């Protein structure tokens, strides 16, 4: 079984989308092995988005993700990384396939409701960044 990191971003939490997104996860058969609502510390956000540090939008990205509560989720299941990314849809909601979370709920590329690890390495790093040892179910 594969694990991945998923996040409902501040825009999704603010708009009350958490129950719908969790229901979609359950319908797909993924197991939630960790879940917590939190406000991300600036340092954590900077580490999380470290690959974008030199990009012009980095400051806006960090401000957005730390600007309200998020729901951090550890998912487990068959092909969880690719499967969750398929459920989310393209980063730009205009390019997201119908029926994906971003096509259904995202308003802009910046406020696109969800995040998901893009590789096994990213998943491992992001899970360790957001969950302490003992917080994930075996």
Curated annotation (Swiss-Prot):
CDD domains: NDPk_I
EC main group: transferase
Reaction catalysed by this enzyme: a 2'-deoxyribonucleoside 5'-diphosphate + ATP = a 2'-deoxyribonucleoside 5'-triphosphate + ADP; a ribonucleoside 5'-diphosphate + ATP = a ribonucleoside 5'-triphosphate + ADP
Binding site for ATP: 9, 57, 85, 91, 102, 112
Coiled-coil regions, chain positions: none
Cofactors that this protein relies on: Mg(2+)
First-listed, main subcellular location of the protein, grouped into a coarse class: cytoplasm
Active site (catalytic residues): 115
Location of this chain's protein in the cell: Cytoplasm
PANTHER family from the UniProt entry: NUCLEOSIDE DIPHOSPHATE KINASE
Protein name, as recorded: Nucleoside diphosphate kinase
Organism: Deinococcus deserti (strain DSM 17065 / CIP 109153 / LMG 22923 / VCD115)
Lineage: Bacteria, Thermotogati, Deinococcota, Deinococci, Deinococcales
Encoding gene (name): ndk
């Amino acid at each position: 079984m594969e694990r991945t990191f998923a996040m409902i971003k501040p825009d999704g939490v603010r708009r009350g989308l958490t129950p719908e997104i969790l229901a979609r996860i359950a319908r797909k058969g993924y197991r939630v092995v960790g879940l917590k609502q939190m406000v991300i510390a600036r340092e954590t956000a900077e580490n999380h988005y470290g690959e974008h540090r030199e990009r012009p939008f980095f400051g806006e990205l960090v401000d957005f993700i730390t600007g309200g509560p998020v729901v951090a989720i550890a998912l487990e299941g068959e092909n969880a990384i690719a499967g969750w990314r398929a459920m989310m849809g393209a980063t730009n909601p205009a390019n997201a396939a119908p029926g994906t979370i971003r096509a259904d709920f995202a308003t802009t590329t910046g406020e696109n409701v969800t995040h998901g690890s893009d590789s096994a390495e990213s998943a491992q790093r992001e899970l360790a960044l957001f969950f302490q040892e003992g917080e994930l179910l075996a």
